[in-house]
């Protein structure tokens, strides 16, 4: 259950990073 929440959070972060083009901050993910 907790792992599923982490996956959803990562997906949100990836989408935000793609939209904002924050390559340096998002390359860590």
From Swiss-Prot:
Is Hydrolase a UniProt keyword of this protein? no
| Tissues in which the UniProt entry reports expression | Expressed by the venom gland.
Q: Which UniProt keywords apply?
A: Disulfide bond, Secreted
Q: Where in the cell is it found?
A: Secreted
Asked if the Swiss-Prot or TrEMBL record annotates the protein with the keyword Plastid, the reply is no
The principal location of this protein is secreted
> What is said about its interaction partners and assembly?
Heterodimer composed of subunit SS1 and subunit LS1 (U1-PSDTX-Pt1b), and heterodimer composed of subunit SS1 and LS2 (U1-PSDTX-Pt1a); disulfide-linked.
As a miscellaneous remark, the entry gives: There are 6 heterodimeric myrmexins which consist of a small subunit (SS1 or SS2 or SS3) disulfide-linked to a larger, quite structurally unrelated subunit (LS1 or LS2).
* Protein name listed in UniProt: U1-pseudomyrmecitoxin-Pt1 subunit SS1
Q: Which organism is it from?
A: Pseudomyrmex triplarinus
